[in-house]
Swiss-Prot record:
Sites of Phosphoserine modification: S94
Active-site residues from the entry: C267, H449
Protein name: Ubiquitin carboxyl-terminal hydrolase MINDY-2
Lineage: Eukaryota, Metazoa, Chordata, Craniata, Vertebrata
Sites marked Ubiquitin-binding: D543, L546, A547, L550
Residue stretches of biased makeup (Low complexity): 141-163, 170-191, 564-599
An annotated GO BP: proteolysis
UniProt source species: Bos taurus
Keyword list, A-Z: Hydrolase, Phosphoprotein, Protease, Thiol protease, Ubl conjugation pathway
Family note: Belongs to the MINDY deubiquitinase family. FAM63 subfamily.
Reaction catalysed by this enzyme: Thiol-dependent hydrolysis of ester, thioester, amide, peptide and isopeptide bonds formed by the C-terminal Gly of ubiquitin (a 76-residue protein attached to proteins as an intracellular targeting signal)
Biased composition (Basic and acidic residues): 606-630
Region Disordered, annotated ranges: 1-209, 564-630
Polar residues bias locations: 24-33
Length: 630
Protein backbone atom coordinates (compact mmCIF):
# COMPACT_ATOMS: atom_id res chain seq x y z
CA UNK A 1 0.00 0.00 0.00
CA UNK A 2 1.56 3.26 -1.03
CA UNK A 3 1.67 5.97 1.57
CA UNK A 4 0.17 9.26 0.61
CA UNK A 5 1.63 12.68 1.34
CA UNK A 6 -0.82 13.35 4.14
CA UNK A 7 0.29 10.28 6.08
CA UNK A 8 4.02 10.92 6.04
CA UNK A 9 4.76 11.25 9.75
CA UNK A 10 8.16 10.20 11.08
CA UNK A 11 8.20 7.63 13.84
CA UNK A 12 10.40 8.72 16.75
CA UNK A 13 11.96 6.45 19.33
CA UNK A 14 9.92 6.12 22.46
CA UNK A 15 6.58 6.74 20.81
CA UNK A 16 4.11 3.95 20.28
CA UNK A 17 3.48 3.03 16.70
CA UNK A 18 -0.20 3.80 16.54
CA UNK A 19 -2.18 4.05 13.35
CA UNK A 20 -2.08 7.29 11.50
CA UNK A 21 -5.41 8.95 10.78
CA UNK A 22 -7.07 7.26 7.91
CA UNK A 23 -4.41 4.61 7.50
CA UNK A 24 -5.86 1.73 9.44
CA UNK A 25 -5.21 -1.73 8.11
CA UNK A 26 -8.20 -3.55 6.62
CA UNK A 27 -7.15 -6.70 8.47
CA UNK A 28 -6.10 -5.34 11.81
CA UNK A 29 -7.65 -8.24 13.67
CA UNK A 30 -5.47 -10.78 11.98
CA UNK A 31 -2.08 -9.10 12.06
CA UNK A 32 0.89 -11.01 13.40
CA UNK A 33 4.44 -10.47 14.30
CA UNK A 34 6.60 -10.10 11.23
CA UNK A 35 10.35 -10.50 11.33
CA UNK A 36 12.62 -9.08 8.66
CA UNK A 37 15.15 -11.65 7.54
CA UNK A 38 18.20 -11.49 5.36
CA UNK A 39 21.28 -9.36 5.34
CA UNK A 40 19.48 -6.09 5.92
CA UNK A 41 18.44 -4.82 9.36
CA UNK A 42 15.54 -6.67 10.88
CA UNK A 43 12.32 -4.90 11.88
CA UNK A 44 9.72 -6.33 14.23
CA UNK A 45 6.18 -5.15 13.81
CA UNK A 46 4.69 -3.65 16.93
CA UNK A 47 1.85 -5.72 18.36
CA UNK A 48 -0.25 -5.94 21.48
CA UNK A 49 -0.64 -9.07 23.56
CA UNK A 50 -4.04 -10.66 23.48
CA UNK A 51 -3.93 -11.33 27.22
CA UNK A 52 -2.73 -7.94 28.47
CA UNK A 53 -4.24 -5.62 25.91
CA UNK A 54 -1.19 -3.41 25.86
CA UNK A 55 0.96 -2.51 22.88
CA UNK A 56 4.64 -3.39 22.76
CA UNK A 57 7.05 -2.72 19.92
CA UNK A 58 9.98 -5.09 19.55
CA UNK A 59 13.07 -3.85 17.78
CA UNK A 60 16.57 -2.86 18.60
CA UNK A 61 15.15 -0.56 21.36
CA UNK A 62 12.20 -1.32 23.60
CA UNK A 63 9.19 0.89 23.18
CA UNK A 64 7.37 -0.41 26.21
CA UNK A 65 7.34 2.96 27.93
CA UNK A 66 5.20 4.57 25.28
CA UNK A 67 2.80 7.40 25.69
CA UNK A 68 -0.31 5.23 25.52
CA UNK A 69 -2.19 4.91 28.82
CA UNK A 70 -2.08 1.56 30.56
CA UNK A 71 -5.10 -0.60 30.20
CA UNK A 72 -6.42 1.08 27.08
CA UNK A 73 -6.41 -1.20 24.05
CA UNK A 74 -4.30 0.18 21.28
CA UNK A 75 -4.53 -1.13 17.73
CA UNK A 76 -1.13 -1.24 16.06
CA UNK A 77 -0.75 -1.50 12.32
CA UNK A 78 1.71 -3.81 10.53
CA UNK A 79 4.90 -2.70 8.86
CA UNK A 80 3.18 -2.34 5.52
CA UNK A 81 1.09 0.62 6.72
CA UNK A 82 3.78 2.53 8.58
CA UNK A 83 4.48 5.58 6.39
CA UNK A 84 8.09 6.01 7.48
CA UNK A 85 10.25 3.91 9.74
CA UNK A 86 13.81 5.24 9.68
CA UNK A 87 15.64 2.97 12.08
CA UNK A 88 19.37 2.46 11.99
CA UNK A 89 20.95 -0.95 11.86
CA UNK A 90 22.76 -0.34 15.15
CA UNK A 91 19.41 0.30 16.85
CA UNK A 92 17.78 -2.79 15.42
CA UNK A 93 20.27 -5.51 16.35
CA UNK A 94 22.07 -6.30 19.54
CA UNK A 95 25.87 -6.69 19.56
CA UNK A 96 25.49 -10.43 19.99
CA UNK A 97 23.58 -10.64 16.73
CA UNK A 98 26.13 -8.86 14.54
CA UNK A 99 27.44 -12.14 13.12
CA UNK A 100 26.45 -12.47 9.52
CA UNK A 101 24.24 -15.49 8.92
CA UNK A 102 24.83 -18.12 6.32
CA UNK A 103 22.97 -17.37 3.11
CA UNK A 104 19.75 -19.31 2.82
CA UNK A 105 19.08 -18.79 6.55
CA UNK A 106 17.92 -15.71 8.35
CA UNK A 107 19.05 -14.71 11.78
CA UNK A 108 16.43 -13.98 14.41
CA UNK A 109 17.72 -11.93 17.28
CA UNK A 110 16.27 -9.98 20.11
CA UNK A 111 17.92 -7.51 22.46
CA UNK A 112 17.85 -8.04 26.25
CA UNK A 113 15.55 -5.05 26.59
CA UNK A 114 13.12 -6.62 24.16
CA UNK A 115 13.19 -9.91 26.01
CA UNK A 116 12.45 -8.15 29.31
CA UNK A 117 9.66 -6.17 27.73
CA UNK A 118 8.22 -9.32 26.24
CA UNK A 119 8.29 -11.06 29.61
CA UNK A 120 6.52 -8.14 31.31
CA UNK A 121 3.78 -8.14 28.71
CA UNK A 122 3.25 -11.86 28.41
CA UNK A 123 5.34 -12.42 25.29
CA UNK A 124 7.77 -14.93 26.81
CA UNK A 125 7.33 -18.29 28.45
CA UNK A 126 5.53 -16.65 31.38
CA UNK A 127 2.92 -15.16 29.08
CA UNK A 128 -0.24 -16.71 27.78
CA UNK A 129 1.07 -17.82 24.39
CA UNK A 130 4.84 -18.06 24.72
CA UNK A 131 7.33 -17.42 21.96
CA UNK A 132 7.01 -20.71 20.16
CA UNK A 133 6.03 -21.36 16.57
CA UNK A 134 2.34 -21.79 15.93
CA UNK A 135 0.97 -24.17 13.37
CA UNK A 136 -0.64 -22.67 10.34
CA UNK A 137 -3.97 -21.12 11.17
CA UNK A 138 -3.62 -20.67 14.94
CA UNK A 139 -2.91 -16.96 14.65
CA UNK A 140 -6.23 -16.37 12.96
CA UNK A 141 -8.10 -18.47 15.51
CA UNK A 142 -6.63 -16.62 18.47
CA UNK A 143 -7.27 -13.34 16.73
CA UNK A 144 -10.92 -14.20 16.27
CA UNK A 145 -11.21 -15.25 19.91
CA UNK A 146 -9.65 -12.04 21.23
CA UNK A 147 -11.79 -9.74 19.13
CA UNK A 148 -11.24 -7.65 16.05
CA UNK A 149 -9.99 -4.60 17.95
CA UNK A 150 -7.09 -6.42 19.67
CA UNK A 151 -4.63 -8.25 17.40
CA UNK A 152 -3.50 -11.41 19.10
CA UNK A 153 -0.03 -12.91 19.00
CA UNK A 154 0.86 -16.51 19.51
CA UNK A 155 4.28 -15.31 20.55
CA UNK A 156 6.82 -12.64 19.89
CA UNK A 157 8.08 -14.41 16.73
CA UNK A 158 6.11 -16.02 13.94
CA UNK A 159 6.75 -16.49 10.27
CA UNK A 160 4.35 -19.28 9.34
CA UNK A 161 1.10 -17.36 9.70
CA UNK A 162 1.85 -14.44 7.48
CA UNK A 163 -1.07 -12.35 6.32
CA UNK A 164 -0.06 -10.87 2.98
CA UNK A 165 -1.23 -7.55 1.79
CA UNK A 166 -4.35 -7.47 -0.35
CA UNK A 167 -3.77 -7.93 -4.07
CA UNK A 168 -3.12 -4.75 -5.96
CA UNK A 169 -1.55 -2.96 -3.01
CA UNK A 170 2.18 -2.83 -2.45
CA UNK A 171 3.65 -2.37 1.03
CA UNK A 172 5.28 0.90 1.93
CA UNK A 173 8.90 0.93 0.87
CA UNK A 174 10.14 2.66 4.00
CA UNK A 175 8.81 -0.16 6.16
CA UNK A 176 10.63 -2.88 4.18
CA UNK A 177 14.11 -3.29 5.62
CA UNK A 178 14.56 -6.69 4.01
CA UNK A 179 13.28 -8.20 0.80
CA UNK A 180 12.14 -11.28 2.71
CA UNK A 181 9.11 -9.34 4.00
CA UNK A 182 7.59 -9.21 0.54
CA UNK A 183 4.73 -11.68 0.35
CA UNK A 184 5.47 -12.36 -3.31
CA UNK A 185 8.82 -13.91 -2.50
CA UNK A 186 8.84 -16.04 0.69
CA UNK A 187 12.18 -16.29 2.41
CA UNK A 188 14.07 -19.40 3.32
CA UNK A 189 13.18 -18.87 6.96
CA UNK A 190 9.55 -19.56 6.06
CA UNK A 191 10.57 -22.92 4.65
CA UNK A 192 12.36 -23.79 7.88
CA UNK A 193 9.53 -22.51 10.05
CA UNK A 194 6.99 -24.81 8.40
CA UNK A 195 8.91 -27.84 7.25
CA UNK A 196 11.79 -27.75 9.71
CA UNK A 197 9.88 -27.07 12.92
CA UNK A 198 10.39 -30.62 14.11
CA UNK A 199 14.13 -30.33 13.53
CA UNK A 200 14.36 -27.29 15.79
CA UNK A 201 12.68 -28.95 18.78
CA UNK A 202 15.59 -31.32 19.60
CA UNK A 203 18.04 -28.42 19.35
CA UNK A 204 16.05 -26.40 21.87
CA UNK A 205 15.87 -29.38 24.20
CA UNK A 206 19.66 -29.78 24.03
CA UNK A 207 20.07 -26.31 25.44
CA UNK A 208 21.07 -24.45 22.29
CA UNK A 209 21.22 -20.71 22.84
CA UNK A 210 18.58 -19.95 20.25
CA UNK A 211 15.33 -18.10 20.60
CA UNK A 212 12.27 -20.36 20.41
CA UNK A 213 10.83 -20.33 16.95
CA UNK A 214 14.02 -18.92 15.43
CA UNK A 215 16.18 -20.51 12.79
CA UNK A 216 19.38 -21.69 14.54
CA UNK A 217 22.68 -20.49 13.20
CA UNK A 218 24.99 -23.29 12.13
CA UNK A 219 28.76 -23.46 12.23
CA UNK A 220 31.08 -23.57 9.27
CA UNK A 221 31.10 -27.35 9.28
CA UNK A 222 27.31 -27.43 8.80
CA UNK A 223 27.11 -24.93 5.95
CA UNK A 224 26.82 -27.50 3.18
CA UNK A 225 24.24 -29.55 5.06
CA UNK A 226 22.09 -26.52 5.78
CA UNK A 227 22.32 -25.31 2.18
CA UNK A 228 21.20 -28.72 0.99
CA UNK A 229 18.24 -28.58 3.38
CA UNK A 230 17.25 -25.14 2.14
CA UNK A 231 17.59 -26.29 -1.46
CA UNK A 232 15.47 -29.38 -0.80
CA UNK A 233 12.87 -27.30 1.01
CA UNK A 234 12.70 -24.81 -1.84
CA UNK A 235 12.28 -27.62 -4.37
CA UNK A 236 9.49 -29.13 -2.29
CA UNK A 237 7.59 -25.91 -1.90
CA UNK A 238 8.41 -24.60 -5.38
CA UNK A 239 8.70 -27.65 -7.65
CA UNK A 240 9.34 -25.44 -10.70
CA UNK A 241 12.13 -23.48 -9.03
CA UNK A 242 15.27 -23.05 -11.12
CA UNK A 243 18.65 -24.00 -9.69
CA UNK A 244 21.86 -22.40 -10.92
CA UNK A 245 25.50 -23.42 -10.52
CA UNK A 246 28.09 -20.95 -9.28
CA UNK A 247 31.50 -20.58 -10.93
CA UNK A 248 34.31 -18.97 -8.94
CA UNK A 249 36.85 -16.94 -10.90
CA UNK A 250 39.83 -14.73 -10.08
CA UNK A 251 38.49 -11.29 -10.96
CA UNK A 252 41.00 -8.50 -10.33
CA UNK A 253 42.97 -10.72 -7.93
CA UNK A 254 39.92 -11.53 -5.85
CA UNK A 255 37.90 -14.74 -5.72
CA UNK A 256 34.57 -13.72 -7.23
CA UNK A 257 31.48 -15.83 -8.02
CA UNK A 258 29.42 -15.68 -11.20
CA UNK A 259 26.09 -17.40 -11.86
CA UNK A 260 26.01 -19.82 -14.78
CA UNK A 261 22.99 -20.56 -16.94
CA UNK A 262 21.72 -24.10 -17.37
CA UNK A 263 19.45 -23.36 -20.32
CA UNK A 264 19.82 -20.90 -23.15
CA UNK A 265 17.07 -18.34 -22.88
CA UNK A 266 16.22 -14.79 -21.85
CA UNK A 267 17.32 -14.54 -18.25
CA UNK A 268 18.09 -10.94 -17.27
CA UNK A 269 18.22 -11.97 -13.62
CA UNK A 270 21.59 -13.67 -14.14
CA UNK A 271 22.98 -10.77 -16.16
CA UNK A 272 22.01 -8.26 -13.46
CA UNK A 273 23.30 -10.40 -10.59
CA UNK A 274 26.59 -11.03 -12.39
CA UNK A 275 27.08 -7.28 -12.81
CA UNK A 276 26.51 -6.78 -9.08
CA UNK A 277 28.79 -9.71 -8.21
CA UNK A 278 31.62 -8.50 -10.44
CA UNK A 279 31.24 -5.02 -8.93
CA UNK A 280 31.35 -6.60 -5.43
CA UNK A 281 28.05 -4.94 -4.55
CA UNK A 282 26.51 -8.34 -3.74
CA UNK A 283 28.56 -11.06 -2.09
CA UNK A 284 27.86 -14.76 -1.69
CA UNK A 285 29.18 -17.09 1.02
CA UNK A 286 32.58 -18.57 0.16
CA UNK A 287 32.66 -21.87 -1.72
CA UNK A 288 28.93 -21.78 -2.43
CA UNK A 289 28.21 -23.99 -5.45
CA UNK A 290 24.44 -23.95 -6.01
CA UNK A 291 21.85 -21.22 -5.61
CA UNK A 292 18.12 -21.10 -6.32
CA UNK A 293 16.19 -18.47 -8.21
CA UNK A 294 14.36 -17.52 -5.00
CA UNK A 295 17.65 -16.82 -3.27
CA UNK A 296 18.82 -14.72 -6.21
CA UNK A 297 15.63 -12.69 -6.04
CA UNK A 298 16.17 -12.22 -2.33
CA UNK A 299 19.73 -10.97 -2.83
CA UNK A 300 18.55 -8.58 -5.52
CA UNK A 301 15.65 -7.27 -3.44
CA UNK A 302 17.86 -6.71 -0.40
CA UNK A 303 20.32 -4.76 -2.51
CA UNK A 304 17.54 -2.59 -3.95
CA UNK A 305 16.30 -1.77 -0.46
CA UNK A 306 19.81 -1.10 0.85
CA UNK A 307 20.61 1.35 -1.94
CA UNK A 308 17.52 3.54 -1.58
CA UNK A 309 18.41 7.20 -1.13
CA UNK A 310 18.29 8.56 2.40
CA UNK A 311 18.23 12.34 2.15
CA UNK A 312 15.98 13.40 -0.71
CA UNK A 313 13.12 15.83 -1.08
CA UNK A 314 9.51 14.87 -0.63
CA UNK A 315 8.79 14.89 -4.36
CA UNK A 316 11.86 12.79 -5.12
CA UNK A 317 10.95 10.34 -2.38
CA UNK A 318 7.43 9.91 -3.74
CA UNK A 319 8.81 9.43 -7.25
CA UNK A 320 11.31 6.88 -5.99
CA UNK A 321 8.62 4.97 -4.11
CA UNK A 322 6.46 4.85 -7.23
CA UNK A 323 9.37 3.55 -9.31
CA UNK A 324 10.21 0.99 -6.65
CA UNK A 325 6.61 -0.18 -6.55
CA UNK A 326 6.57 -0.59 -10.33
CA UNK A 327 9.87 -2.46 -10.21
CA UNK A 328 8.62 -4.84 -7.52
CA UNK A 329 5.65 -5.67 -9.73
CA UNK A 330 7.89 -6.87 -12.58
CA UNK A 331 10.70 -8.50 -10.58
CA UNK A 332 9.26 -11.96 -11.11
CA UNK A 333 9.72 -11.51 -14.88
CA UNK A 334 13.48 -11.39 -14.44
CA UNK A 335 13.53 -15.19 -14.26
CA UNK A 336 11.93 -15.65 -17.68
CA UNK A 337 12.32 -12.50 -19.76
CA UNK A 338 11.61 -8.80 -19.89
CA UNK A 339 9.52 -6.95 -22.44
CA UNK A 340 12.27 -4.81 -23.95
CA UNK A 341 11.42 -2.87 -27.10
CA UNK A 342 14.51 -1.45 -28.81
CA UNK A 343 14.71 1.58 -31.06
CA UNK A 344 17.06 1.66 -34.01
CA UNK A 345 18.46 5.16 -33.42
CA UNK A 346 20.79 4.67 -30.42
CA UNK A 347 22.50 1.98 -28.39
CA UNK A 348 20.73 3.11 -25.20
CA UNK A 349 17.40 4.06 -26.76
CA UNK A 350 14.55 1.80 -25.67
CA UNK A 351 10.83 2.35 -25.61
CA UNK A 352 9.76 3.11 -22.06
CA UNK A 353 8.35 0.05 -20.32
CA UNK A 354 8.05 -0.78 -16.61
CA UNK A 355 10.75 -3.40 -17.08
CA UNK A 356 13.35 -0.70 -17.80
CA UNK A 357 12.81 0.77 -14.32
CA UNK A 358 14.68 -2.17 -12.80
CA UNK A 359 17.88 -1.16 -14.59
CA UNK A 360 17.38 2.50 -13.64
CA UNK A 361 16.92 1.70 -9.95
CA UNK A 362 19.98 -0.56 -9.92
CA UNK A 363 22.01 2.01 -11.91
CA UNK A 364 23.01 -0.65 -14.46
CA UNK A 365 23.32 0.54 -18.08
CA UNK A 366 21.39 -1.43 -20.70
CA UNK A 367 22.74 -1.46 -24.27
CA UNK A 368 21.85 -2.93 -27.64
CA UNK A 369 23.54 -2.80 -31.04
CA UNK A 370 20.60 -3.02 -33.45
CA UNK A 371 21.07 0.30 -35.25
CA UNK A 372 20.34 1.61 -38.72
CA UNK A 373 23.30 2.87 -40.71
CA UNK A 374 22.60 6.60 -41.22
CA UNK A 375 24.38 6.53 -44.60
CA UNK A 376 21.68 4.31 -46.13
CA UNK A 377 18.92 6.83 -46.82
CA UNK A 378 16.14 4.47 -47.92
CA UNK A 379 16.44 2.35 -44.75
CA UNK A 380 16.59 5.45 -42.57
CA UNK A 381 13.43 6.74 -44.23
CA UNK A 382 11.63 3.41 -43.95
CA UNK A 383 12.54 2.77 -40.31
CA UNK A 384 12.45 6.33 -39.01
CA UNK A 385 12.07 6.66 -35.24
CA UNK A 386 10.01 3.50 -34.87
CA UNK A 387 10.61 0.89 -32.24
CA UNK A 388 10.68 -2.77 -33.15
CA UNK A 389 7.00 -3.34 -32.42
CA UNK A 390 6.00 -0.18 -34.26
CA UNK A 391 8.11 -1.17 -37.25
CA UNK A 392 6.44 -4.58 -37.46
CA UNK A 393 3.03 -2.93 -37.43
CA UNK A 394 4.18 -0.48 -40.09
CA UNK A 395 5.34 -3.31 -42.35
CA UNK A 396 1.97 -5.04 -42.07
CA UNK A 397 0.04 -1.85 -42.83
CA UNK A 398 2.30 -0.90 -45.73
CA UNK A 399 1.84 -4.28 -47.39
CA UNK A 400 -1.92 -3.81 -47.32
CA UNK A 401 -1.75 -0.27 -48.66
CA UNK A 402 -2.55 0.68 -52.24
CA UNK A 403 0.10 3.38 -52.30
CA UNK A 404 3.17 2.11 -54.12
CA UNK A 405 5.49 4.32 -52.08
CA UNK A 406 4.23 2.87 -48.81
CA UNK A 407 4.52 -0.64 -50.19
CA UNK A 408 8.12 0.09 -51.14
CA UNK A 409 8.89 1.41 -47.64
CA UNK A 410 7.36 -1.68 -46.09
CA UNK A 411 9.47 -3.90 -48.32
CA UNK A 412 12.67 -2.00 -47.40
CA UNK A 413 11.86 -2.21 -43.69
CA UNK A 414 11.17 -5.92 -43.95
CA UNK A 415 14.46 -6.46 -45.76
CA UNK A 416 16.25 -4.58 -42.99
CA UNK A 417 14.80 -6.87 -40.32
CA UNK A 418 15.65 -9.97 -42.33
CA UNK A 419 19.21 -8.88 -43.06
CA UNK A 420 19.86 -7.96 -39.42
CA UNK A 421 18.26 -11.00 -37.81
CA UNK A 422 21.20 -11.26 -35.40
CA UNK A 423 20.03 -7.94 -33.89
CA UNK A 424 23.52 -6.45 -34.26
CA UNK A 425 24.87 -4.30 -37.08
CA UNK A 426 28.39 -3.08 -37.75
CA UNK A 427 27.27 0.48 -37.20
CA UNK A 428 25.78 -0.57 -33.88
CA UNK A 429 29.01 -2.36 -32.95
CA UNK A 430 31.00 0.80 -33.65
CA UNK A 431 28.59 2.88 -31.60
CA UNK A 432 28.82 0.40 -28.73
CA UNK A 433 32.60 0.51 -28.76
CA UNK A 434 32.60 4.30 -28.59
CA UNK A 435 29.76 4.63 -26.06
CA UNK A 436 30.65 2.04 -23.43
CA UNK A 437 33.16 3.40 -20.94
CA UNK A 438 36.44 1.67 -20.18
CA UNK A 439 35.95 -0.88 -17.40
CA UNK A 440 32.19 -0.33 -17.29
CA UNK A 441 30.00 -3.27 -16.26
CA UNK A 442 26.69 -3.29 -18.09
CA UNK A 443 24.00 -5.52 -19.62
CA UNK A 444 23.89 -6.16 -23.37
CA UNK A 445 20.65 -7.16 -25.12
CA UNK A 446 20.87 -9.21 -28.30
CA UNK A 447 18.85 -12.05 -29.84
CA UNK A 448 16.33 -11.75 -27.00
CA UNK A 449 19.13 -12.60 -24.58
CA UNK A 450 20.71 -10.55 -21.81
CA UNK A 451 24.47 -10.79 -21.27
CA UNK A 452 26.94 -9.15 -18.92
CA UNK A 453 29.32 -6.93 -20.88
CA UNK A 454 32.44 -4.89 -20.15
CA UNK A 455 35.09 -2.95 -22.04
CA UNK A 456 38.82 -3.60 -21.70
CA UNK A 457 41.48 -1.72 -23.67
CA UNK A 458 38.96 -0.54 -26.24
CA UNK A 459 37.43 -3.97 -26.91
CA UNK A 460 34.06 -5.33 -25.81
CA UNK A 461 33.76 -8.64 -23.97
CA UNK A 462 30.73 -10.72 -22.98
CA UNK A 463 30.71 -12.84 -19.84
CA UNK A 464 30.59 -16.58 -20.62
CA UNK A 465 27.78 -17.95 -18.43
CA UNK A 466 27.11 -21.24 -20.21
CA UNK A 467 27.07 -24.08 -17.69
CA UNK A 468 29.14 -26.16 -20.12
CA UNK A 469 32.15 -24.01 -19.20
CA UNK A 470 31.60 -24.45 -15.46
CA UNK A 471 34.90 -26.29 -14.99
CA UNK A 472 36.83 -24.23 -17.55
CA UNK A 473 38.70 -21.79 -15.33
CA UNK A 474 40.42 -20.12 -18.28
CA UNK A 475 37.21 -19.40 -20.18
CA UNK A 476 35.56 -16.35 -18.61
CA UNK A 477 35.02 -13.73 -21.34
CA UNK A 478 34.22 -13.86 -25.06
CA UNK A 479 35.25 -11.05 -27.37
CA UNK A 480 32.59 -9.13 -29.29
CA UNK A 481 34.38 -7.91 -32.42
CA UNK A 482 31.97 -8.84 -35.24
CA UNK A 483 28.30 -9.48 -35.89
CA UNK A 484 28.72 -13.19 -36.64
CA UNK A 485 29.09 -14.25 -33.01
CA UNK A 486 32.38 -16.12 -33.44
CA UNK A 487 34.32 -14.39 -30.69
CA UNK A 488 37.49 -15.57 -28.99
CA UNK A 489 37.53 -16.99 -25.49
CA UNK A 490 39.60 -15.20 -22.86
CA UNK A 491 40.43 -15.74 -19.22
CA UNK A 492 39.59 -13.38 -16.37
CA UNK A 493 42.54 -11.16 -17.33
CA UNK A 494 41.40 -10.98 -20.99
CA UNK A 495 44.22 -13.18 -22.28
CA UNK A 496 43.33 -15.40 -25.22
CA UNK A 497 42.81 -18.98 -24.14
CA UNK A 498 41.63 -22.09 -26.01
CA UNK A 499 38.43 -23.75 -24.80
CA UNK A 500 40.44 -26.66 -23.36
CA UNK A 501 43.92 -27.31 -22.01
CA UNK A 502 46.42 -29.29 -24.16
CA UNK A 503 46.01 -32.24 -21.81
CA UNK A 504 42.28 -32.37 -22.50
CA UNK A 505 42.33 -32.19 -26.29
CA UNK A 506 39.40 -33.79 -28.03
CA UNK A 507 39.96 -37.53 -28.14
CA UNK A 508 39.17 -37.86 -31.81
CA UNK A 509 41.70 -35.23 -32.80
CA UNK A 510 44.33 -36.87 -30.61
CA UNK A 511 43.69 -40.26 -32.21
CA UNK A 512 44.05 -38.75 -35.67
CA UNK A 513 47.34 -37.15 -34.66
CA UNK A 514 48.60 -40.49 -33.34
CA UNK A 515 47.65 -42.30 -36.54
CA UNK A 516 49.38 -39.70 -38.69
CA UNK A 517 52.49 -39.96 -36.54
CA UNK A 518 52.58 -43.75 -36.82
CA UNK A 519 52.10 -43.56 -40.57
CA UNK A 520 55.00 -41.13 -40.86
CA UNK A 521 57.20 -43.44 -38.79
CA UNK A 522 56.37 -46.44 -40.97
CA UNK A 523 57.17 -44.51 -44.13
CA UNK A 524 60.42 -43.33 -42.63
CA UNK A 525 61.45 -46.85 -41.66
CA UNK A 526 60.55 -48.15 -45.11
CA UNK A 527 62.61 -45.46 -46.75
CA UNK A 528 65.55 -46.18 -44.48
CA UNK A 529 65.34 -49.91 -45.24
CA UNK A 530 65.53 -49.16 -48.94
CA UNK A 531 68.65 -47.08 -48.36
CA UNK A 532 67.53 -43.75 -49.64
CA UNK A 533 70.47 -41.43 -49.99
CA UNK A 534 69.26 -38.31 -48.18
CA UNK A 535 72.62 -36.66 -48.59
CA UNK A 536 71.94 -36.13 -52.28
CA UNK A 537 68.91 -33.97 -51.46
CA UNK A 538 69.90 -30.30 -51.31
CA UNK A 539 69.48 -28.50 -48.00
CA UNK A 540 67.43 -25.58 -49.25
CA UNK A 541 64.76 -27.69 -50.89
CA UNK A 542 61.17 -26.81 -50.06
CA UNK A 543 58.63 -29.17 -48.57
CA UNK A 544 56.69 -29.28 -51.82
CA UNK A 545 59.72 -30.29 -53.89
CA UNK A 546 60.71 -32.87 -51.32
CA UNK A 547 57.22 -34.32 -51.38
CA UNK A 548 57.30 -34.49 -55.18
CA UNK A 549 60.61 -36.35 -55.16
CA UNK A 550 59.38 -38.78 -52.57
CA UNK A 551 56.25 -39.37 -54.60
CA UNK A 552 58.28 -40.02 -57.75
CA UNK A 553 60.45 -42.50 -55.88
CA UNK A 554 57.38 -44.20 -54.51
CA UNK A 555 55.82 -44.43 -57.99
CA UNK A 556 59.02 -45.93 -59.40
CA UNK A 557 59.13 -48.58 -56.71
CA UNK A 558 55.47 -49.37 -57.17
CA UNK A 559 55.90 -49.90 -60.94
CA UNK A 560 58.91 -52.13 -60.32
CA UNK A 561 56.93 -54.15 -57.81
CA UNK A 562 54.06 -54.60 -60.28
CA UNK A 563 56.48 -55.78 -63.00
CA UNK A 564 57.96 -58.38 -60.70
CA UNK A 565 54.49 -59.62 -59.86
CA UNK A 566 53.59 -59.93 -63.55
CA UNK A 567 56.78 -61.88 -64.31
CA UNK A 568 56.14 -64.30 -61.49
CA UNK A 569 52.58 -64.87 -62.72
CA UNK A 570 53.79 -65.54 -66.30
CA UNK A 571 56.41 -68.04 -65.12
CA UNK A 572 53.83 -69.90 -63.09
CA UNK A 573 51.47 -70.06 -66.09
CA UNK A 574 54.19 -71.46 -68.41
CA UNK A 575 55.21 -74.06 -65.86
CA UNK A 576 51.66 -75.29 -65.52
CA UNK A 577 51.26 -75.44 -69.32
CA UNK A 578 54.44 -77.52 -69.78
CA UNK A 579 53.41 -79.88 -67.04
CA UNK A 580 50.04 -80.50 -68.65
CA UNK A 581 51.67 -81.08 -72.07
CA UNK A 582 54.15 -83.63 -70.72
CA UNK A 583 51.37 -85.45 -68.92
CA UNK A 584 49.35 -85.74 -72.13
CA UNK A 585 52.30 -87.26 -74.09
CA UNK A 586 53.16 -89.76 -71.38
CA UNK A 587 49.64 -91.20 -71.18
CA UNK A 588 49.47 -93.12 -74.60
CA UNK A 589 53.04 -94.43 -74.33
CA UNK A 590 52.60 -95.93 -70.90
CA UNK A 591 49.60 -98.05 -71.92
CA UNK A 592 51.45 -100.45 -74.44
CA UNK A 593 54.27 -100.92 -72.05
CA UNK A 594 51.92 -102.04 -69.36
CA UNK A 595 49.87 -104.27 -71.77
CA UNK A 596 52.68 -106.41 -73.23
CA UNK A 597 56.26 -106.63 -72.02
CA UNK A 598 58.84 -106.04 -74.79
CA UNK A 599 62.46 -106.90 -75.23
CA UNK A 600 65.44 -104.79 -74.17
CA UNK A 601 65.72 -103.33 -77.67
CA UNK A 602 62.19 -102.08 -77.67
CA UNK A 603 62.62 -100.54 -74.24
CA UNK A 604 65.72 -98.66 -75.38
CA UNK A 605 63.82 -97.20 -78.31
CA UNK A 606 61.01 -96.11 -76.05
CA UNK A 607 63.43 -94.39 -73.71
CA UNK A 608 64.88 -92.45 -76.61
CA UNK A 609 61.42 -91.39 -77.70
CA UNK A 610 60.68 -90.19 -74.17
CA UNK A 611 63.87 -88.11 -73.95
CA UNK A 612 63.29 -86.34 -77.25
CA UNK A 613 59.99 -84.63 -76.29
CA UNK A 614 61.45 -83.66 -72.95
CA UNK A 615 64.34 -81.88 -74.59
CA UNK A 616 61.96 -80.16 -76.98
CA UNK A 617 59.77 -79.01 -74.09
CA UNK A 618 62.78 -77.55 -72.28
CA UNK A 619 63.80 -75.60 -75.36
CA UNK A 620 60.29 -74.22 -75.74
CA UNK A 621 60.24 -73.12 -72.08
CA UNK A 622 63.57 -71.33 -72.48
CA UNK A 623 62.25 -69.46 -75.52
CA UNK A 624 59.11 -68.37 -73.65
CA UNK A 625 61.07 -67.18 -70.64
CA UNK A 626 63.46 -65.20 -72.77
CA UNK A 627 60.54 -63.50 -74.54
CA UNK A 628 58.90 -62.52 -71.26
CA UNK A 629 62.10 -61.04 -69.86
CA UNK A 630 62.65 -58.95 -72.99
Amino acid sequence: MESGPESLQPLEHGVAAGPAPGTGSPQEGQQETRLAAGDGPGVWAAESSGGKGQGAAAGGRSLSDSASPAGSPQVLVPCSSLPRLDLKESDLESPAAQKEPVRGQHKVTASPETAEAGADHGLGPEGDGGARPDPAGTCQEESAAAGSSEPSSGGGLSSSCSDPSPPGESPSLDSLESFSNLHSFPSSSEFNSEEGAENRVPEEEEGAAVLPGAVPLCGEEEVEEEEAQVLAASKERFPGQSVYHIKWIQWKEENTPIITQNENGPCPLLAILNVLLLAWKVKLPPMMEIITAEQLMEYLGDYMLDTKPKEISEIQRLNYEQNMSDAMAVLHKLQTGLDVNVKFTGVRVFEYTPECIVFDLLDIPLYHGWLVDPQIDDIVKAVGNCSYNQLVEKIISCKQSENSELVSEGFVAEQFLNNTATQLTYHGLCELTSTVQEGELCVFFRNNHFSTMTKYKGLLYLLVTDQGFLTEEKVVWESLHNVDGDGNFCDSEFHLRPPSDPETVYRGQQDQIDQDYLMALSLQQEQQSQEINWEQIPEGISDLELAKKLQEEEDRRASQYYQEQEQAAAAAASASASASASASTQAPQSQPVQASPSSGRQSGNSERKRKEPREKDKEKEKEKNSCVIL
